[in-house]
């Protein structure tokens, strides 16, 4: 079963806690020269696995951010970028063409810049322009460097005073993640069984993944992306209550395609009562079409524990689903093809 994991993807899952542990020291050793007192908004530039940390920062700091934070995926930067903007340029490889292009566009606004990368052209750009720079360890697929990207930025923004309730000491979170990881890795544990059994349920199916705003909205997207890249499996994601205003009507279609779907609801055990009622009613509608429904709940008490408990579980499900599909979780042939063809232009 594990023979297709030629790149030892599993080791990255097991060692996620180390990324959290090392992030604070990485920031301490980084060159950060932006001026927090001048910042009135944050613009986060990134793509794929390098971008999702920006959305997670927005979600997890929803109650605490002192300034607006926008995430932009693409070649351009918005016109509002100016001298009061902190532009976070995130590219794990340092060579993401869209992000480098957007960063170049953002320079016209005379903003302050913070680059986060493992090297490449972004490192060179940051050093040449004397930007704040966070260098993180290389050797990971960008999507599996999420801990480094998210938590170094968490510490950088927190120490700068750009959000309230900053926790400098994340040891309790590290211990929480360590315990959950052991459960996900042990063959007979409940978390491992959940991950493996859900992977069996999803084999050959299309996943419809739903979460809720504001704290969990990016978690559904993370599951979707991990199913795409790791499992080589088609998946779609949406967020409640928004999907109750549009997508829910799509289930009125008379289609045999519904037999290929499985609906996964990523749920907060302390969710708003109206969200809980919406999920209940949404599931009634979906069940009418014979679509199997799976509920996965958060664990922990803090927002960080809840969010990363679901991220960890989703990563393990995507891993087992990749093995079920006889696919190496690390390989991304279609993305490699696109990059190689675009490089010829």
Feature-to-residue mapping (PLM):
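Active-site phosphate/pyrophosphate-binding segments
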Residues: 5-15, 27-31, 37-40, 158-261, ...
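Conserved, well-structured ligand/cofactor-binding cores
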Residues: 7-36, 78-83, 172, 294-308
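Short gly/ser/thr-rich secondary-structure transition/capping motifs
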Residues: 22-29, 67-73, 189-192
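Short helix-capping/linker segments at secondary-structure and domain boundaries
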Residues: 25-27, 66, 156-166, 231-232, ...
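Glycine-rich phosphate-binding loops that contact phosphosugars or nucleotide phosphates
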Residues: 36-182, 200, 268-271, 276, ...
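A generic structural motif
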Residues: 71-74, 233-244, 292-301
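C-terminal active-site/capping subdomain that shapes the small-molecule cofactor and substrate pocket
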Residues: 249-333
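C-terminal helix-rich "cap/oligomerization" subdomain common to oxidoreductases
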Residues: 328-345
């Amino acid at each position: 079963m594990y023979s297709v994991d030629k790149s030892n993807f599993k080791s990255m899952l097991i060692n996620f806690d180390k990324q959290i542990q090392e992030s604070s020291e990485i920031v301490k050793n980084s060159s950060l020269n932006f001026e927090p007192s001048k910042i009135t908004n944050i613009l986060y530039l990134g793509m794929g696995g390098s971008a999702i940390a920006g959305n997670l920062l927005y979600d997890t700091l929803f109650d605490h951010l002192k300034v607006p934070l926008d995430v932009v995926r693409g070649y351009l930067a918005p016109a509002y970028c100016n001298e009061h903007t902190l532009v976070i340029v995130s590219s794990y490889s340092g060579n993401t063409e869209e992000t480098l292009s957007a960063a170049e566009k953002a320079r016209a606004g005379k903003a302050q810049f913070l680059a986060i990368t493992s090297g490449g052209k972004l490192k060179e750009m940051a050093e040449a322009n004397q930007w704040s720079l966070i260098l993180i360890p290389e050797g990971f697929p960008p999507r599996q460097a999420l801990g480094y990207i998210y938590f170094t930025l968490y510490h950088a923004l927190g120490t700068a005073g750009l959000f309230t309730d900053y926790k400098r000491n994340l040891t309790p979170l590290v211990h929480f993640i360590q315990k959950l990881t052991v459960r996900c890795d042990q063959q007979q544990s409940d978390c491992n069984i959940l991950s493996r059994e859900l992977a069996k349920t999803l084999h050959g199916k299309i996943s419809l993944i739903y979460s809720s705003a504001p704290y969990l909205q990016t978690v559904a997207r993370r599951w979707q992306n991990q199913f795409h890249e790791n499992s080589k499996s088609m998946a779609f994601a949406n967020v409640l209550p928004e999907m109750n205003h549009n997508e829910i009507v799509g289930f009125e279609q008379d289609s045999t395609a519904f037999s290929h779907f499985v609906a996964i609801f990523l749920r907060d055990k302390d969710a708003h009562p109206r969200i809980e009622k919406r999920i209940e009613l949404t599931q009634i509608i979906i069940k009418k079409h014979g679509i199997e429904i799976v509920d996965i709940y958060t664990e922990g008490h803090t927002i960080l524990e809840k969010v990363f408990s679901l991220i960890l579980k989703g990563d393990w499900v995507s891993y087992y689903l990749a093995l079920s599909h006889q696919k190496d979780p690390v390989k991304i042939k279609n993305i490699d093809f696109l990059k190689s063809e675009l490089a010829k232009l």
